[in-house]
Amino acid sequence: MDLSKIAVGVNPPYDLNAIIEIPQGGEPVKYEIDKESGALMVDRFLHTAMFYPANYGFIPHTLADDGDPADIMVVGPTPVVPGAIIRCRPIGTLMMVDEAGSDEKILAVPVDKLHPFYTGVTSWRDLPTILTEQIAHFFQHYKDLEKGKSTKISGWADPDETAEIIRTAIKRYNESY
């Protein structure tokens, strides 16, 4: 896959492309797409017996504070195969830091054209509370047994703050490349 040919989205920061690396419900394996070759690589095996609560990947042509593309989770009716691109609407951000610093996780839903189930969802608050709690719990604990690694959740950012996080990540990418 030539990542340079995949747009940020149709209408960033409100309609984005997410490149999925790990399917929703996926086994405790951390996959990452190699940014140079486009190949799906095993980054590591999670030391905890946990599964990913949402389809997980990144937004192309973005650069987060940690030097990687912006992370994104896309909740949906089914797992999405790794390497697939899904159009989505951001609805919030899980504010998180890990041992290396800021590591926000943008939360999104599929655009209505793909599935109308999330039409009325405009904020992370519109999702079932148990789902947002499961997402926060996963990211609070998925590194627990890895030596030298840690995470801390500080809460959720609303859609407006999320749009600004995405704009900043796009700007940072454009200034770096």
UniProtKB/Swiss-Prot annotation:
Keyword Cytoplasm appears in the UniProt entry: yes
Residue sites binding substrate per the record: K30, R44, Y56, Y142
Transmembrane segments: none
Main location (coarse class): cytoplasm
Cofactor: Mg(2+)
Family the UniProt entry places it in: Belongs to the PPase family.
Keywords: Cytoplasm, Hydrolase, Magnesium, Metal-binding
GO molecular function, one term: inorganic diphosphate phosphatase activity
Description of how the protein assembles with itself and partners: Homohexamer.
Binding-site residues for Mg(2+) 1, renumbered to this chain: D66, D71, D103
Chain sites annotated for binding Mg(2+) 2: D71
Enzyme class, spelled out: hydrolase
Swiss-Prot/TrEMBL catalytic activity: diphosphate + H2O = 2 phosphate + H(+)
PANTHER family named among the record's database cross-references: INORGANIC PYROPHOSPHATASE
UniProt function note: Catalyzes the hydrolysis of inorganic pyrophosphate (PPi) forming two phosphate ions.
Pfam families: Pyrophosphatase (PF00719)
GO terms, biological process: phosphate-containing compound metabolic process
Location(s), subcellular: Cytoplasm
Enzyme Commission number(s): 3.6.1.1
Protein name, per record: Inorganic pyrophosphatase
